[in-house]
Amino acid sequence: MKTTMNNEMKNMIVGKRVYYALTNNVKARDDDSVLYIDVLKQYGCSTNMRATTLEKRVSEGVLPSRDTVTRYRRYLQRVDETLRGTLWNKRQAYASVVRKSI
């Protein structure tokens, strides 16, 4: 029970940080790398952190994974049109074409 509550709290915090990044950094709306760096900065991470240190902190659950941040971006952009970047409509149109070809 306690672990579930901790995970829910962590997810809520990640979601808020992704939302903050999307509202304050227009480039983050179309570029997941920019978004992830912005979120990591909110956790107090340096931009010249070693990759091994980053991976260790992600595996320990101290930092969110890149996939988690991307999922939150997709969710937030789906439910809030103001957070969508210039590429959002292009991605949706392409996804529609791919679905039809399958």
Indicate where each model-derived feature is located.
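Short intrinsically disordered terminal tails
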Residues: 1-5, 99-102
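Short Lys/Arg-rich cationic patches that frequently serve as NLS/NoLS or arginine-rich RNA/DNA-binding motifs
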Residues: 2-5, 70-74, 89
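DNA-recognition alpha helix
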Residues: 31-60
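Short Lys/Arg-enriched helix C-cap and helix-to-coil transition segments
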Residues: 81-98
